[in-house]
Amino acid sequence: MASTLKSLRALSAPSRVRLLALLNESELTVRELTEITGMRQSGISMHLGQMQEAGLVESSRDGKNAYYRVARDSGAETGLLIELAAAGVAEIPEHASDLVNLKRILERRENQDLVYFNRVAG
């Protein structure tokens, strides 16, 4: 478990708060986060690495994709920090467009899954 101070430091940048709020809604890849936020891939990867080191996010692999999500068993203190970040993200101007873009990405992902399963099921 990461220290509380390390977690607080990780949440000191609005960009990381935006990313954490999105990951609190759904598991996402770096490519999807890039598309949603308009941030550069290298910046997102750096932010995710810092939040992962702080124990705020975790990742899992599915084929060639790494999916990031809010840490599941993060402990009470870290869970509280995640809740506070999710509540405070509304103060960041880009958050409204992030949510619109997130919805679009999730709908596209769902449609791609349906096409795949319909093709496989024949």
Please give the residue ranges for each predicted region.
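A structural preference for long, well-packed, hydrophobic secondary-structure segments
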Residues: N24, Q50-E53, V89-A90
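Conserved active-site tyrosine of GNAT-family acetyltransferases
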Residues: M51, Y68, F117
